[in-house]
């Protein structure tokens, strides 16, 4: 489940043993230890909402994604999924699809290593060679942590998540996996469970995976979660007008979106390193320096999807999708 830490929530998990063939029950936890309750009223409720085969334990074991509820079974204030479920239902006839590109950075966690606390591929002090050869690279001099990325991708497949690819990113030790296209709220479930699997699998290498949007200051790329979006109207022949309409709609609420796309977004959206500045909105074909990129093939086909390049790696996929279903989907449906 997702805890109540701010400005960036974390994942929590625990193990329950149940009878074979029974459904996961309503459960609970100490909310005072997760910033979701006070000590004198500490109980919070776990409501199972999605389950997946557990690729870590194997067998008949499952991973259960839960919403956090109050004891009266109303959604907890930290529960961002519940609002998305309602919004997605309202716009279901427009069949919104999402594809999210989750970037992350591996860090060394061995206390006896001179590289403790450094991104993988960084020397004990100073910096590696400048960016340029690491993106989608191959070879021990360019790529760091591939075995973890591969193990994670395999686990996502075994869990039935909608993973569609992985690649090494621009900065050493930085990787990305893609989930989608998947509808809402499922896309959020898949991203959060994929994050949990990433953290859990990296444990076995004594490596941490972080979603820090600007892991290294200076001339190094940040980490985002580019969000690809389309509706039925955008995917149909002649849907290019609906794509442009969605871009215009997103521009009207640009400030609201940026404020809810992940903490410390100003550190990443600077106008450099393939970003538009956080206080400027733009869209364009093939433009990775724009807020919204329209892929060149979409312009050729006159239908398809858009890519929002603003969301941070640490953004909440439920919140991002909620903003889209209430803004872009609403506008293109008219």
Regions found by a protein language model. Give the residues of each.
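Short, solvent-exposed loop/turn segments at the edges of secondary structure
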Residues: 59-61, 99, 170-172, 220-224, ...
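Conserved hydrophobic/aromatic pocket- or pore-lining residues that grip, position, or stack substrates
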Residues: 104, 198, 227
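ATP/Mg2+-dependent ligation/transfer catalytic cores
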Residues: 1-168, 190-193, 207, 320, ...
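A short, contiguous, amphipathic alpha-helix enriched in charged residues
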Residues: 152, 191-204, 246-249
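Loop-rich catalytic cores of soluble enzymes, especially ATP-dependent carboxylate-amine ligases
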Residues: 176-186, 203-313
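Active-site-proximal, well-structured secondary-structure segments within enzyme catalytic domains
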Residues: 167-178
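Conserved small/polar residues in nucleotide/adenosyl-binding loops
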Residues: 324-329
């Amino acid at each position: 489940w997702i805890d109540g830490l701010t400005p960036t929530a974390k994942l929590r998990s625990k193990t329950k043993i149940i009878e074979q063939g029974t459904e996961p029950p309503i459960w609970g936890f100490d909310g005072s230890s997760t910033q979701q309750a006070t000590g004198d009223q500490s109980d919070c409720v776990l409501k199972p909402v999605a389950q997946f085969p557990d690729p870590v334990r194997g067998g008949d074991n499952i991973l259960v994604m839960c919403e956090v509820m109050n004891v009266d079974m109303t959604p907890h204030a930290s529960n961002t999924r519940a609002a998305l479920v309602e919004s997605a239902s309202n716009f279901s006839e427009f069949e919104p699809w999402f594809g999210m590109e989750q970037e992350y950075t591996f860090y060394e966690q061995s206390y006896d290593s001179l590289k403790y606390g450094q991104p993988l591929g960084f020397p004990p002090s100073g910096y590696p060679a400048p960016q340029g050869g690491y993106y989608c690279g191959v070879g021990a001099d360019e790529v760091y942590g591939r075995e973890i990325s591969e193990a994670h991708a395999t686990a996502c497949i075994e869990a039935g998540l909608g993973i569609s690819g992985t690649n090494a990113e621009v900065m050493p030790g930085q990787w990305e996996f893609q989930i989608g296209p998947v509808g809402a709220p499922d896309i959020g479930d898949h991203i959060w469970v994929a994050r949990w699997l990433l953290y859990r699998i990296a444990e076995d290498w004594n490596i941490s995976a972080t979603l820090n949007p600007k892991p290294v200051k200076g001339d190094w790329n940040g980490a985002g979660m580019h969000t690809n979006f389309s509706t039925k109207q955008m995917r149909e022949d002649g849907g290019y007008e609906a794509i442009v309409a969605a871009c215009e709609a997103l521009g009207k609420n640009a400030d609201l979106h940026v404020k809810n796309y992940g903490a410390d977004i100003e550190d990443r959206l600077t106008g450099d390193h393939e970003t538009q500045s956080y206080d400027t909105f733009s869209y364009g074909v093939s433009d990775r320096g724009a807020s919204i990129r329209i892929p060149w093939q979409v312009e050729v086909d006159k239908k398809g999807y858009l890519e929002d390049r603003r969301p941070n790696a640490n953004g909440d996929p439920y919140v991002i999708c909620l903003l889209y279903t209430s803004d872009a989907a609403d506008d293109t449906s008219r």
